[in-house]
Every structure is written in C-alpha cells, then in structure tokens.
Regions:
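Structural motif corresponding to the intra-repeat A-B loop/turn of tetratricopeptide repeats
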Residues: 18, 52, 56-59, 105, ...
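Residue-level recognition of tetratricopeptide repeat
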Residues: 13, 47, 51-54, 100, ...
C-alpha cells in the first residue's frame, strides 16, 4: 500500500542521502515491494543497487538495478513520464560506467555477457546492442561484428550511435577483405 511505502521511502532516504546504499537498498526494497508504482522510490532503489555494483563489481547488484529501471522505463502513464525518462537516462549512465570499468580491465567478455543478459530480458535494447558490438570490435572478433552489426544498427535511435554501428561493421568487413560490403557500410556513416 502507498502509505507503508512512503514510510520506507522516508526511512531509506536518510541512508540514501548519506550514500549508505546497502542500508538504503534494504529499506527501499521493502517499500518497492509494498508499492511498485512509487517510481521515485524505485529510482532510488535502482540507483542504490547500481552504486553498490560500481563499488564492488557485483554484477548481480547491477542486474537488480537494471530490472527496476526497466520496470520504471516501461510505465506509459503520463504521470510517470518524468521518472520513466530518468530511468532510461540512469540505465545508460550506469551501463556505460560499468562498461568503462570493464574496458579498463580489458574484460570484453564481461561486457558481452552483461549485454547478452540485458538482451535476454529486452531484445530491443539499443544500449545493450551498442555496447556488445563495440566489445566484439575491441576483441577483433570481426565475424561476430559482421553477424550482429546490421541488427545493432537497426535498433539504434540516436543517429550518432547508428553511425558508430555502421562504422564498426564497415571496419569488420574491411578487416575480412570484403571491400564492397565495407564500402556499403561506410556509406551509412553520417
């Protein structure tokens, strides 16, 4: 119920503001269970999980956060519009942060696994398709880039991201000495 959730939101707020994300997530999780439509609290819960994942590298925390962000992002009622937009922003932010962390460790397989897990839940995730294609390109797995490149380009909504997918695809064709395909892909780069 709504008022129970509000109590948890207030209790969790102190811990959250003090960046005690472990405590905050425990309290917010109870509130979220009581009222999944309290999107403000849901966002704080998701952020708590993602912050813990960033400091510990625990992918299960990251996945919990993404699941909640996905749920908020999927809400279509106009009253949720602002929080749904924020959920999408934060998903991109934390995914990119996690990717950067893994890239620094040259953990391209970790990035691919993370993207595959996201795509299992949401096959149309432009973000997951994007980071996965970049990881395969960084691994120089050109066959995989060629296999996945067009689908990755097709789901991108941002023209710059779409361009990057075609650029990676063109570079992969080029590396495989497939000149006509490389030229065709590079022509799609804006």
């Amino acid at each position: 119920s709504g008022w129970v959730a509000k109590i948890y939101q207030i209790q969790g707020g102190d811990a959250f503001n003090n960046k005690d994300y472990a405590t905050a997530s425990e309290i917010f999780a109870k509130g979220y269970a009581a009222d999944p439509d309290n999107t403000g609290m849901a966002l704080n819960l998701a952020m708590s999980y993602c912050e813990m994942a960033m400091s510990s590298g625990d992918m299960s925390q990251y996945e919990k956060g993404m699941e909640i962000y996905e749920a908020v992002a999927a809400k279509t009622h106009p009253k949720y519009a602002e929080d749904a937009a924020k959920a999408k922003e934060d998903m991109a932010l934390y995914t990119n942060n996690m990717v950067a962390k893994m890239q620094a460790a040259n953990d391209f397989d970790g990035i691919i696994k993370m993207a595959d897990d996201l795509l299992a839940k949401n096959p149309q995730s432009a973000l997951a398709q994007n980071v996965r294609l970049q990881a395969y390109a960084n691994k120089k797995d050109y066959a995989k880039v060629i296999e996945l490149g067009q689908a990755a380009a097709d789901v991108q909504t941002d023209p710059a991201d779409k361009s990057l997918m075609y650029y990676l695809l063109g570079a992969a064709y080029n590396a495989k000495e497939m000149k006509p395909q490389a030229i065709a892909a590079f022509k799609q780069v804006t």
